Amino acid sequence: KNLSVVTSATAASKSTIVVNGVKEGAKWYYVTAATQAALEAVTAGTAITKANWTELTANGLEITPTSGHKYIRVVDVDSADKPLAVGDAILSIGE
């Protein structure tokens, strides 16, 4: 299932992450990367490796991505950390 993810530039080097819709699973996690191909892969039915992800604790959370990172992937996981939905977006970062 696809998540609709949008980002908005805020303060210098920061971006606000908004996931449209209601969280279906237990938690949201995100990862950023310099290219879309470099984003952490997600496989249906296989738990994510939480050490590679950061919990998105609130919708509309402001983050400070690693310098040079231009993409974000958000995953909605169940209580066993298995993906229910995933979405990618280009990071809008404040200057």
Please identify what each model-predicted range represents.
Residues 80-95:
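Extracellular fibronectin type III
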Residues 9-18:
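Short coil/turn motif common to extracellular beta-sandwich-like domains
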Residues 74-76:
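Conserved structural position at the C-terminal beta-strand
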